[in-house]
A protein has these predicted regions:
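Cytoplasmic-side transmembrane-helix entry/capping segments in multi-pass membrane proteins
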Residues: 1, 52-62, 106-118, 135-140, ...
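Glycine-/small-residue-enriched transmembrane alpha-helix faces in small-molecule transporters
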Residues: 1-24, 130-155, 270
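Membrane-interface interhelical linkers
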Residues: 1-6, 35-59, 108, 158-160, ...
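Hydrophobic/small/kink-forming positions within alpha-helical transmembrane segments
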Residues: 5-9, 39, 61, 65-69, ...
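Juxtamembrane helix-entry segments on the extracytoplasmic side of multipass membrane proteins
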Residues: 20-22, 28, 50-54, 126-145, ...
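Specific alpha-helical transmembrane segments that line the substrate/conduction pathway
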Residues: 25, 32, 73-102, 219-236
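Helix-helix packing/entry segments at the starts of transmembrane helices
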Residues: 84-89, 156, 160-172, 207-239
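C-terminal-most transmembrane helix of multi-pass membrane proteins
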Residues: 227, 231-270
Length: 270
């Protein structure tokens, strides 16, 4: 999951620069470039492309592309850091969904730790009274669908290879992203081509390792680690974009790490 969050943070940094390209077009390029990796891996290793749990695989693809599209759309209305932070309502939704769909139990102390980490995410970027209402709605719905992604992957379990799961997601995203971007297509120029292809590279590794994580561990144990993506994104902001963060940002990072460590220790004792 740590490898996954680092890869997604790199992808977020790229999205930050693609302000002139529509969300569905970004979805298309992010997905189509990943297909070279997924199809290549499956063919090389003689893994059945269609998989076993086909209905769940299709559902995972549809839920995933919905969440991803809404997230990219929200970045047009919200700062990328704010969008990434607010998307981290997803593990909270995943933990709640896991109670009903996976029959997992979450102890009261774990809810306290989840809350601590979530408060840290909010503090990390501060409270902005000028946030766009439409953007907030988009990112909120994106977080709900992202939480559902975790549940579907857990339902698939070890019945399908992680790359098969990712491949379904990429195929569905390529088709839907391509079709929905036709009317608003913008021809990339220069370095934008490299950035768009980079979306697929980082997105591929992010999806594969996230899928592996949820296949081998309980949702309520793995999902909170997704908060690390916020930390990685902020570090990239400092290193690549010379962004400056306040003491409130440092407090937010401390709360996130503290909440995750306490949850891991608590789960270990149980």
């Amino acid at each position: 999951m740590i490898i996954s969050t680092l890869a997604f943070a790199c992808m977020n940094a790229i999205v930050k620069h693609l302000t002139d390209i529509g969300a569905f077009q970004i979805v298309f390029f992010r997905s189509v470039s990943s297909l070279f990796f997924t199809f290549g891996f499956l063919i090389k290793n003689n893994i059945p492309i269609l998989g076993n749990n086909r209905k769940l695989l299709i559902l995972r693809g549809l839920v995933g592309v919905t969440s991803m599209s809404l997230f990219f759309m929200s970045t047009k209305y919200l700062p990328i850091g704010t969008a990434v932070s607010l998307r981290y309502m997803a593990p909270i939704f995943a933990a709640v969904f896991a109670i009903f769909f996976l029959k997992e139990k979450i102890k009261p102390f774990q809810w306290l730790f989840f809350t601590m980490a979530f408060v840290g995410v909010l503090i990390l970027k501060g409270f902005d009274t000028n946030l766009d209402g439409y953007g907030l709605i988009l990112i909120f719905i994106s977080a709900i669908f992202s939480g559902l992604v975790y549940i579907v992957i857990s339902k698939i379990g070890k019945g399908d290879h992680p790359v098969v799961v990712v491949n379904y997601f990429m195929v569905i995203s390529t088709v839907l992203g391509g079709v929905l971007s036709i009317n608003n297509w913008v021809n990339p120029e220069g370095i934008e081509w490299i950035m768009l292809l980079g979306l697929g590279l980082f997105g591929y590794f992010g999806q594969v390792y996230m899928t592996k994580a949820f296949q081998i561990a309980a949702t309520n144990q793995v999902a909170p680690l997704k908060y690390l993506e916020v930390i990685f994104t902020l570090l990239l902001g400092v290193l690549l974009f010379s962004e400056i963060y306040t003491l409130y940002s440092l407090l937010g990072i401390a709360l996130i790490i503290f909440g995750l460590v306490l949850n891991a220790l608590y789960k270990g004792k149980k």
